[in-house]
């Protein structure tokens, strides 16, 4: 009787899991299939084609948006990683109470609604007389990426042995040399994960970018939004598919990085 109940429970659990996966990924799979459909119809299959991908890469508007997206994602992730790593070191050296308070404040931007962050940054830029454009998107992305870097680096810093750093200093090493030779190798997996996570978050962002971009500049997410409002084109399916696959690859790299595997073993 117990065995029968156990099997029934497993069947229900597996069915529930499959149902969740279908609801989550069926729309994405449908979009990916339509990106290879030669027919513009969303209900009829006209045969396999790559013309929508060719059309996408031939579009100057899409290529400009792609360059903007990659440039903003890379630069913002790089700067956020540098600032976030430095901030993590400073926070880690604090006493327990102020460290807890600062970490709580740091976590607020991650818990805050993107629309609130986007509007707040837009109003701040306007108040300081900064014209909305490429630079404001970059600043906004650096701002919301820093907490994610701190979140990735802090656990690694807590695992480091402070005595080795102090020993290097006692042996005559400068603080910078001691950091890069002793501390950085230990926190490197966390720094790399923070960079990849920041790059992914920047690549995928729409709401904050929408409020801080100004006129005359687009990223892939804002371009897709503006194009969809005029009517869905098959090239948008192709573009969305590429974005999804790019984000998926980055997440896989982040989760299966050599440093993380080593840590788990």
Residue ranges and their predicted role:
Residues 1-60, 64-67, 71, 258-265:
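N-terminal, non-cleaved signal-anchor transmembrane helix
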Residues 1-10, 75-106, 123, 179, ...:
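Transmembrane-helix boundary motif in ABC transporter permease subunits
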Residues 2-16, 154-169, 175-184, 237-265:
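C-terminal transmembrane helix and the adjacent membrane-cytosol boundary/short C-terminal tail
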Residues 15-16, 21-28, 150-153, 161-162, ...:
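Transmembrane alpha-helices
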Residues 26-29, 33, 82-86, 119, ...:
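Membrane-embedded alpha-helices of multi-pass transport/permease systems
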Residues 41-43, 50, 115-144, 176, ...:
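Membrane-interfacial helix termini and adjacent extracytoplasmic/periplasmic loops
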Residues 63, 67, 71-83, 87, ...:
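Hydrophobic alpha-helical transmembrane segments of multipass integral membrane proteins
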């Amino acid at each position: 009787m117990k065995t029968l109940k156990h099997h029934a429970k497993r069947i229900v659990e597996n069915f529930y899991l499959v149902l969740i996966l279908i609801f989550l990924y069926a729309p994405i799979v449908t979009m990916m299939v339509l990106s290879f459909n030669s027919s513009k119809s969303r209900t009829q299959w006209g045969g396999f084609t790559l013309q929508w991908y060719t059309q996408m890469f031939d579009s100057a508007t899409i290529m400009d948006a792609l360059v903007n997206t990659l440039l903003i994602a890379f630069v913002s992730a790089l700067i956020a990683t540098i600032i976030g790593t430095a901030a993590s070191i400073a926070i880690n050296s604090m006493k327990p109470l102020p460290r807890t308070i600062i970490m709580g404040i740091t976590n607020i931007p991650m818990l805050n609604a993107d629309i609130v962050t986007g509007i707040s940054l837009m109003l701040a830029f306007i108040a300081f007389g900064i014209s909305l454009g490429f630079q404001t998107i970059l600043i906004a992305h650096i701002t919301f990426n820093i907490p994610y870097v701190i979140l990735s680096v802090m656990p690694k810093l807590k695992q480091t042995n402070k005595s080795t750093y102090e020993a290097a200093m006692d042996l005559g090493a400068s603080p910078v040399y001691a950091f890069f030779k002793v501390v950085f190798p230990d926190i490197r997996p966390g720094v790399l994960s923070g960079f990849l996570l920041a790059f992914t978050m920047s690549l995928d962002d729409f709401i904050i970018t929408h409020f801080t971009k100004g006129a005359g500049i687009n990223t892939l997410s804002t371009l897709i939004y503006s194009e969809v409002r005029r009517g869905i084109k098959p090239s948008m399916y192709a573009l969305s598919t590429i974005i999804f696959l790019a984000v998926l690859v980055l997440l896989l790299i982040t989760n299966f990085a050599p440093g993380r595997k080593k840590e788990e073993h």
